[in-house]
């Protein structure tokens, strides 16, 4: 197994670029929303890496600092904690970040902490302090991006999500979990990852890879108490083999919906995935289909809500539960589906938020007939 500072690990492949695009796009929404209503927000990077890739591409710490610098008008203070256990990577990160901050205009609004340690140690100590004093974390985004599946105890994720304004964005290394699942010498690490013996909880048949992802998400909901979760599949850049899933978990619908929109738009329509070497061909083929086809969503809305009146916001939030049945549609699809139902006489609207009858948003009321 390659060491974390091995040069082969620091080539910025296409799946890494896609992952960082997802992170950056979400932070561009997260910082203004949380920063405007809170005196302090925090970005916690548990596997911060070297700062830059071999080709000069910025790593997650640099991406986060640059986004925060651009959006400084929206917050009073943002804290960054960058954790990296590999000594060579940590030293390089220190140097890269020092150079970056020379051109950062709003560094006075940033509190930056670099920690040479393991993620679980640093996060665990922080959570111990919070729990000891019965405090609550400030709005915090935890980016947990390991190379493998060790060093990321499920109990840490559970404790993070116990604070209502926290979010977890986790690289779940499905390929490695599936490959090493049956090895007796790794049973302890698998149990730590899932917060229980995952092998006993898997169904006896079916797609094991999908079951491994869904089991982790079920733990987030049933054990950690997360209200919402999403996942985005990423394949090897030069093949169609699944490498990992990015899993987002939180307790706030607005954040969930924003991340869902980011993921939807990043992947081929409706797939929530980067498909490796098949990605371009899939995108080309999808141009032959209507991305606004909401037939399935109309059926779902009628089945769930016939005879009821809900706000537009409540409609979109309600279909997120139960989590394993959430449809792969975003706000624009709900708007198109409901307007189509109104035209067909299957629903009526009462404007509350919208200023005209043509609008549909927020607290506008929808009665499903």
Task: List each language-model region with its residue ranges.
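Glycine- and acidic
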Residues: 4-12, 201-202, 320-321
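Conserved SAM-binding loop and adjacent beta-strand
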Residues: 12-25
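Class I S-adenosyl-L-methionine
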Residues: 131-140, 147-340, 344, 350, ...
């Amino acid at each position: 197994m390659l060491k974390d500072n091995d040069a082969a690990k620091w080539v910025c492949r296409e799946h890494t670029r896609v992952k960082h695009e997802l992170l950056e796009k979400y932070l561009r929404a997260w910082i203004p929303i949380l920063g405007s209503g809170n005196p302090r927000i925090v970005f916690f990077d548990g596997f911060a890496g070297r700062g830059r890739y071999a080709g000069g591409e910025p790593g997650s710490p640099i991406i986060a600092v640059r986004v925060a610098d651009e959006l400084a008008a929206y917050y009073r203070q943002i804290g960054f904690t960058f954790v990296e256990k590999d000594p060579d990577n940590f030293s390089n990160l220190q140097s890269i970040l020092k150079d970056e901050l020379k051109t950062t205009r709003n560094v006075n609004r940033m509190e930056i902490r670099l920690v040479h340690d393991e993620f679980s140690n640093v996060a665990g100590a922080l959570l111990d302090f919070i729990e000891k004093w019965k405090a609550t974390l400030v709005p915090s985004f935890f980016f947990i991006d390991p190379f493998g599946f060790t060093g990321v105890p499920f109990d840490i994720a559970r404790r993070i999500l116990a604070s209502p304004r926290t979010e977890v964005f986790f690289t779940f290394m499905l390929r490695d979990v599936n490959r090493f699942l049956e090895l007796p010498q790794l049973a302890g690490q698998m149990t730590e990852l899932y917060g229980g013996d995952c092998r006993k909880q898997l169904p006896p048949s079916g797609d094991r890879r999908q079951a491994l992802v869904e089991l982790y998400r079920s733990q987030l909901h049933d054990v950690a108490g997360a209200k919402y979760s999403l996942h985005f599949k990423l394949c090897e850049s030069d093949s169609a083999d699944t490498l990992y899933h990015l899993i987002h978990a939180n307790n706030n619908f607005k954040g969930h919906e924003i991340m869902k929109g980011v993921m939807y738009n990043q992947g081929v329509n409706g797939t929530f995935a980067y498909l490796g070497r098949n990605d371009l061909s899939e995108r080309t083929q999808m141009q032959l289909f209507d991305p606004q086809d909401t037939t399935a969503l109309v059926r779902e809305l009628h089945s769930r809500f016939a005879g009821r009146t809900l706000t537009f916001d409540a409609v979109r939030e309600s279909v997120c539960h139960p989590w394993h049945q959430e449809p792969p549609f975003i706000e624009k699809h709900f708007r198109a589906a409901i307007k189509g139902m109104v035209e067909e006489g299957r629903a009526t609207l009462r404007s509350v938020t919208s200023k005209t009858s043509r609008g549909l948003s927020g607290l506008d009321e929808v009665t499903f007939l």
